Amino acid sequence: MEILNNLAERVISGEKLTKEEGLQILSIPDELVMDLVEEASKVRKYFFKNQMEFCSLINAKNGACTEDCSFCAQSSHYKTPINAYGLVSKDEMLAGAEKAVAINANRYCIVVSGRKASKEEVDKIADAIKEIKKTYPIKVCCSLGTVDEKDLDKLKVAGVDRINHNLETSEKYFSKIVSTHTWKERYKTIKKIQKVGLSTCTGGIFGMGESDEDIIDLAMTYRDLEVDSIPLNFLIPIPGTPLGDKHNLTPLRCLKIIALFRLFNPKSEIRLCGGRELNLKDYHDIAFEVANCLMAGGYLTRAGREPGKDEEMARRLGRELIKNGASFSVSNE
């Protein structure tokens, strides 16, 4: 296909792909997906060489969420098989950081359920961050829902390195999956994060019934925002949620989406997270010809694969893991 001609060279030179070209990328025939991966891989190698980063998270507050996100097990609107609990202790947050270091994660994210963390919760998390930064050689991220500038300043002083807040899908499609808050609220939160000078991590979930245009709109929004990290999640249908019986993704469809985000956001980290194992299947390793980061050690309400398998993959692919500001080859031990 013509869209594949000199595609990587155009992106590397600084050319911005158009929405029409994005539509062509997502409609590439399955037999040409490996050619698309090759082009996107050239872009990844140019900007990130052979480096790979692991991150890990702690589900620091689970369930009882007032929001009605159709994909989420933690919403109080649905009957789902989860164990709700309040904010964990500082010791538990520190223990999570220790586990993250042990699996060679370069980042550790403290995640809480709910639309917005309370002032008390922010204070406790900030206190834990200070202790983590003194104790462990790891970058600390937070995902606390909607945050105001005072909270962000407090977290920044504590030593947080990055804030996660996902847009999830396009502005046009968002109201189809969430009714209790707006896409604009999430967008404004990202702008606040950038305003205080913190690194941004913001991504999406795919397989929720969105169109090709929705996917491209999200990729272009992140390009306009110049975000640092884009976590890509692929729907894990959760019984009890409105999307509990939806599963229309194929591995090749996932590869097209990953390649699209790399080509539209060449300088952003492309981080594969929830649903990567379930949806990519035998193409899992191939996806990391394009992506350069991953979430290791499990997700919020679902287990991932053993971290050792991700290290084995990094070794097979000849990648160097980034850890504590340096990169190293994964040993065979």
Curated annotation (Swiss-Prot):
Residues 47-276 form the Radical SAM core domain. Pathway: Cofactor biosynthesis; biotin biosynthesis; biotin from 7,8-diaminononanoate: step 2/2. It catalyses: (4R,5S)-dethiobiotin + (sulfur carrier)-SH + 2 reduced [2Fe-2S]-[ferredoxin] + 2 S-adenosyl-L-methionine = (sulfur carrier)-H + biotin + 2 5'-deoxyadenosine + 2 L-methionine + 2 oxidized [2Fe-2S]-[ferredoxin]. [4Fe-4S] cluster binds at C65, C69, C72. This is Biotin synthase. Binds 1 [4Fe-4S] cluster. The cluster is coordinated with 3 cysteines and an exchangeable S-adenosyl-L-methionine. Binds 1 [2Fe-2S] cluster. The cluster is coordinated with 3 cysteines and 1 arginine. Belongs to the radical SAM superfamily. Biotin synthase family. Its cofactor is [4Fe-4S] cluster; [2Fe-2S] cluster. Homodimer. SMART domains: BATS (SM00876), Elp3 (SM00729). One of its GO terms (biological process) is biotin biosynthetic process.
